Amino acid sequence: MTMSDIEDSDVENYDIAGKLALRSDDELGSDDEQNTSGEEGEEVELQDEIVSSDDDDDDGDKGKDTGKMPPTKKAKLDRKPGSDFDFASLDFEAEDNEEEDKTLSSILALSNPTAKKAKAGSFASFGFSKFLLANIAKKGYKQPTPIQRRSIPLIIDNRDVVGMARTGSGKTAAFVLPLIEKLKLRSPSGVRAVILSPSRELALQTYKQVKEFSHGTNLQSIVLIGGDSLEEDFGKMMTKPDIIVCTPGRFLHLKVEMQYDLMSVQYIVFDEADRLFEMGFAEQLNELLLALPSNRQSLLFSATLPRSLVEFAKAGLTNPVLVRLDADSKLSENLQMAYFTTKRNEREANLLYILQEVIKMPLGTPEEVKKLAAMDKRSIESDEENEEAKEQNNGKKRKYKFKKERMPSAKELPSEKSTIIFVPTKHHVEYVTSLLKDAGYLVSYIYGTLDQHARKNQLYLFRIGLTKILVVTDVAARGIDIPVLANVINFTLPGSSKIFIHRVGRTARAGNKGWAYSIVNSSELPYLLDLEIFLGKKLLLTSMHEAKCELLKKKQGGSFIPPRINYTERLVVGAIPRLDLETFQELYENLLRNNYEIKVLKDVAAKGEKLYHRTRQPASQESLKRSKEILETNSWDDQHLLFGENLEKMKDDFLAKLQNRNVKETVFELKKKGVKENDSLAEFMHRRRRQLAPIQRKAQERKELLQKERLAGLSHGIEEEVLKIDGEASGYNQNVDEAELQETFELGDEAHNKKKTFKDPQFFMSHYAPASVIQDQQLSIASSFANDAQAATFDLDNDDKLQKNKQQVMKWDKKKGKYINSMSTDKKYIISENGTKIPATFRSGKFDEWRKQRNLKPTSSLTNNETPENNKRFKHKKQSVPKLPDKYRDDYHKQKQKVEKALDSGMRVKGYNKPGMQQELKSTEQIRKARAIKEQRRAKNARPSRRK
């Protein structure tokens, strides 16, 4: 069927979302910045992106369309049965990428004539305007990523979308590009788009992309983040911008403080949606959602979302479509991981060893240290001068322009060994930063409560490559704009598998390879086993690999080749070589001994870690049981396979052979060897050995039996693992076949009420629990975001780690004369528009004071229907009092005429009164003043009144 046949056919109602739902087996794209050019000013031609491939044909074929649309299967916009609020899901059929791109271009050409000549699979095939295509080309983007290719057409078609793709797949551009395409021009009606980001850094990063893609338009966009001046934000909001990029706390504060009307919002985006709904903003988010119009378009994007998204009905989605790209592959295929076991007090030594021996991190040269100190000093001085200028200029900041270093492009590493270290609390940030600086490394640091100016400065130093290491917490690292990294180090293993994905997702982007190193102790082993199930990647201990090699030796004989260790598909666990680790432990102890400040910071971090362990979510019971079994084998802390042969173990094996010799004697027996006389000590040792022999034999048999039971309980043994074909997935993932998909989902456009099966998903109990069920349990969102924050899937811990659930303690209140709950506060609440209680601190009256100082109308008088412009041209009608005439000036008579004219018009001029203008009757204020003056004169003169 040709394109002309399609246009002439009776079937004209093409569902864009339906036709785009084609399953492709291509790998996920890299991050937003993967295709950016090295220079911002580089000119890129648009011809390659817009011109159709038909233009390259021969002249004889021009005007002749010989291509046919590939046969496609209609997409299934499915709904889960048995749910009150159904979410549609895009069912991607297995098709080649080329066919999918051609189909996408053909379908969009039907709805948008500007996309008819667009090259298949390009940004122009979406029907974007010329200015937007030019901005995309300036950024260096050539082809859309999978999440962009599948979600942008749905967004343009005004569908609510829930997008799930891993970190760095281009989610930001997926909602920013259609947003700008739909808004295009400035509108005085008010705010039309709101983008909510969970962190300040992510908001700034999104705002930067909005500004770059909207270049050439008159769209006005602002960014609202915590830490900035409220007065500046008041001024921004009063300009009625088109696009607001903000963090939820500051935006809700301004909304309540200013009583701002949001009924003009057409487009709202929840970036990193899972985190937004788990930050404790339950009441405030409900208030915000109710303040938005019902016909808005809502979009949710995140790297990790559960398969069942019914709970996101709170966000007010209408007939949403789920676009999910990483249901099976949650990590980059280029990411290699290594897990190093540690003892209680050797975590810092492990960190120093990884940096120096594994990553080969260079120490800072004297020139680099001097340059870093100079830039820090310059930043502090400019900040102080900025504060002084702000006080002198009535709150206006003075911008200082310094010569900035060249930022690397998105494809370049900030530095060759750029490494980010994740720690649990802000106390650990200060401790680890001081430790590494004292060891000679160049370090930047960021945590949640750090000043905004300091954040930008620390991130800038890392981006330009002046510092090689960045120490962060999970809260602060969310959304930090670092396109490419070489290494990620987990100082402690996170308590959630989703947090781990967000951490390690910062490396191995844009087709680059990356490493993720994690330091794990025995208490964190259950979380590692949870991660094993969640990722679908099996644990690999050194003993397991050695047993595998022995089995292969028996099978292959002389042709044995040691198997290659796959650090991408397996979780390889082991310890750092003992002798080397002891050297770095001595180095750490010397640093601690010579620097009192580090010792103090270590004590503070230790207290914070105790509270962190007390409040983090527990591991699953199954993982706790398995961790005990692994710890009993005493093989989980063998030397890591990354370091080759274990010389210490070879020495121990040799000593064990000596210990298992046939003739065993003690020193008492050796002395009396060859002497026929009976010796009491030698006889005693013989008798003792005969008594212990049965006990030792039973203990050995018990150990072997436990080992057999453990191996029998595994899903597959070492033999099965060896016989596997190389490259085959060795995890717990189970591919869902087509029959199960058709049974689970329904067509989105049809309202089917009949059940597909007799099973009730709420009560049916299967005879087995597949691994996908465990994965969904870890990905699931609790029934209530507000009430079950503890059980939420992805709960990032605060930097200072305040305890969430403290026991209620009663204390005596002297003023009230009774015992009160120590947890109770006198926080005042106000009733919002929908009747919910919100903190009264949100309504402090600062905006009213700011407005009165500037003589501005209240926001209630600037509603959408009563805008100041009102689409009319204003005429200047203000009349001012003329200047008083001066005899000694040339314009005396002219000014006198102006005064007379003003008096005739009824205006009052000081010193000039016409008949009838002066008020004859005195006011009460004039009478009071006259009496006061009279009393003063009488007291001054002190003379009695004259009597006649």
Curated annotation (Swiss-Prot):
Domain called Helicase C-terminal: residue spans: 395-552
Gene Ontology terms describing biological process: assembly of large subunit precursor of preribosome; maturation of 5.8S rRNA from tricistronic rRNA transcript (SSU-rRNA, 5.8S rRNA, LSU-rRNA); maturation of LSU-rRNA from tricistronic rRNA transcript (SSU-rRNA, 5.8S rRNA, LSU-rRNA)
GO cellular component, as recorded: cytosol; nucleolus; preribosome, large subunit precursor
Bias (Acidic residues) ranges: 1-13, 27-60
Key words of the record: ATP-binding, Helicase, Hydrolase, Nucleotide-binding, Nucleus, Ribosome biogenesis, RNA-binding, rRNA processing
Motif placement: DEAD box: 271-274
Source species, domain of life: Eukaryota
Biased composition (Basic residues): 395-404, 939-948
Chain intervals with Polar residues compositional bias: 856-868
Disordered, as annotated region: 1-80, 378-408, 849-948
EC nos: 3.6.4.13
GO MF entries: ATP binding; ATP hydrolysis activity; identical protein binding; RNA binding; RNA helicase activity
Location, primary (coarse class): nucleus
Residue span of motif Q motif: 121-149
Catalytic activity: ATP + H2O = ADP + phosphate + H(+)
Annotated localization: Nucleus, Nucleolus
Pfam families: DBP10CT, DEAD, Helicase_C
Disulfide bonds, paired cysteine numbers: none
Physiological role: ATP-binding RNA helicase involved in the biogenesis of 60S ribosomal subunits and is required for the normal formation of 25S and 5.8S rRNAs.
Family to which this protein belongs: Belongs to the DEAD box helicase family. DDX54/DBP10 subfamily.
Domain comment (free text): The Q motif is unique to and characteristic of the DEAD box family of RNA helicases and controls ATP binding and hydrolysis.
Protein name listed in UniProt: ATP-dependent RNA helicase DBP10
Name of encoding gene: DBP10
